[in-house]
Amino acid sequence: MAVMDAEPATTGPAGLIARLREKLTGGSSEASLTRRLAGTIFVIRVISAGLAYFSQVLLARWMGTSDYGVYVYVWTWVLLLGSMMDFGISASAQKIIPEYRARGEHALLRGFLSGSRWLTFAVSALVSLGLAGLVKLLSPWIEPAEELPLYIGCMTLPAFVVANTQDGIARSHDWMQLGLMPQFIIRQALIIGITACAFLLGYHLGAVAAMIASAGAVWIAMTGQMVVLNRKLAGHIEPGPKAYDVSGWLAVSLPILLVESFYLLLSYTDVLVLQQFRPSDEVGVYFAVVKTLALVSFIHYAMSATTAHRFAEYNASGDKARLSAYVAHAINWTFWPSLAATIVLLALGKPLLWLFGPQFVVGYDIMFVAAIGLVVRSAIGPVERLLNMLGQQKICALAYALAFAMNLVLCIALVPHFGGHGAAAATSISLSFETVLLFWIVRQRLGLHVLAFGK
């Protein structure tokens, strides 16, 4: 069965529009389904980006650059740790659930759908208590303005982790809206609503108030997502006994956790190192630049979220030609939209940064440095998901570890002297290095060409 849809030989404006509509929504093949799901995810992420951008603009203007910088620093820790504390189960769900379904192991499937969430909640709650104790222990060396926001961040983590796990479960059933909307739209809307109410009521909107609003938004969104997910699962899977293969889950998840952890460390090292060497207001400017370019990474995220469980299915069926065509399709639909989005964002960079405040426009030239790495990385598409789903988690984790180590060394070397420019340069160089490594690994291990151009 062909993976790619045939293109009608229509010409003229009407024909071009028809072909574009067919490209995006037509057909019944896996490629068409992937485009529709990826389009859904991309729309959700774009709306989320708009809400997040709006909320960050409001917070930056209401809080000032210094308080905003503290909030950004603490929230970055929440994003980093919260995304690592699920053992990789949110990602491995896209491998485990399709395999259980294919093998008819319904008891194990039911056990995973409930047990994975209880497991991640219990462990993340214990780890959060330990982290709060660590903050208390290190309080003499922590800036006073950061201490209370860090405690609030610890309280946020369990809900954040469970939401990630539920996202993975929902995506494995192709319920993209349920997986993503609570985290990326409802949560952002709640943050805007809570902080706006506090501001209008005359409360001082500092880093503490912003973190309280963010924590409340995370818990509310996660709880609502849990209620809806449980109802959908009840109608999708027949009741019956549950079996729990925790060791088997962890055997799949922990190598993926290594990949995800090094990816996250690579993503957030620049902000965390910048906070150690530069003033909080400079961190705020750099974060505004990163937020402005976030649309580019959303395209990669959309394709990753829709293709991972397909990679696992096609590999299990043994159809390498089908897998190869699907991989090429995913790469093309990652790179070319990413390139177009980068060009548009760079063209509109100054007015977008000005929305945060006139003082944020100084970060415009940093955008060009940061954009290089994003475009280079998009040229190989979601190959990290391909490696994870095809049992190459360890070598993929090694590639990310090397890229993270390079990024950390470069950030420490460049940030003290060049600030945000140095952080952006370090990240772009590291992303380019990671791209070369992943391309070579897939070529050697899987024999697949994973570049948007050439053979």
Label for each model-derived stretch:
Residues 160-183, 372-399:
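Membrane-interface junctions at transmembrane-helix termini in multi-pass inner-membrane proteins
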Residues 151, 181-233, 402-406, 420-444:
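Hydrophobic alpha-helical transmembrane segments
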Residues 16-34, 203-211, 224-267, 310, ...:
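Interhelical loop/hinge segments that connect adjacent transmembrane helices in multipass membrane
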Residues 36-48, 74, 87-136, 148, ...:
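Membrane-water interface segments that mark the loop-to-transmembrane alpha-helix transition
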Residues 26-34, 135-153, 280-282, 320-321, ...:
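Interfacial segments at transmembrane-helix termini and the short loops linking adjacent helices
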Residues 14-15, 33-91, 128-132, 156, ...:
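Signature of the first transmembrane helix
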Residues 87-102, 172, 289, 293-318, ...:
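Helix-loop junctions and terminal segments of transmembrane helices
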Residues 53-67, 199, 203, 261-295, ...:
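Helix-terminus/linker motif at the lipid-water interface of multi-pass membrane proteins
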